[in-house]
Amino acid sequence: MSFTGTQQKCKACEKTVYAVELLSADGVGYHKSCFKCTHCKSRLQLSSYSSMEGVLYCKPHFEQLFKESGSFNKNFQSPAKSADKSTPELTRTPSRVAGRFSGTQEKCATCSKTVYPIEKVTVESQTYHKSCFKCSHGGCPISPSNYAALEGILYCKHHFAQLFKEKGSYNHLIKSASIKRSAAAAVAAGVPAASVPES
């Protein structure tokens, strides 16, 4: 008696995939060992992969693809392969017009770094990274539909109410918000936080 296996082929290597090694993603079968990022070749997990038109990527490279091209068009920018290159690619300064094509110019209200569309949260005409959009008191995750803001500082509703109950007013929060804004501005300007005077 012989076991013939399945007729399903791995999309990556086109060889037969047996049930014990079958991984099915987006309705397509792969060997576990063939389920890799197209760009870096690292092994992927079903819980942490992205695909575009059947091409597999790890989450960081999928996001990088979007950031570099401004769209999900499956093409990473590849460096020119010229033999007479005298300076490494990473040390070159961008041209004057490069800023016009580098995506968004929006800055995060919390960290002052560029916010790309894939990681953007906008509330009250302020833009944040998803990772920066959290309660300033406890670091709790918040959402655009479940937060409170005072003087531009974000809070979860629980901590906002708790801080009000502690003092009976929001005056101490306004002072704290002013200090946090001053410290953030100093960090963005390159001044050490210890030298920022408290008001």
Curated annotation (Swiss-Prot):
The keyword Nucleotidyltransferase does not apply. Keywords: Actin-binding, Cytoplasm, Cytoskeleton, LIM domain, Metal-binding, Repeat, Zinc. Expressed in roots, leaves, stems, flowers and siliques. Barely detected in pollen. One of its GO terms (molecular function) is actin filament binding. Its main location: cytoplasm. It comes from the Eukaryota. It is found in: Cytoplasm, Cytoskeleton. PROSITE patterns: LIM_DOMAIN_1, LIM_DOMAIN_2. InterPro entries: Znf_LIM. One of its GO terms (cellular component) is cytoskeleton. Interacts with F-actin. Cross-links actin with a constant of dissociation of 0.5 uM. This is LIM domain-containing protein WLIM2b. It comes from Arabidopsis thaliana (Mouse-ear cress).
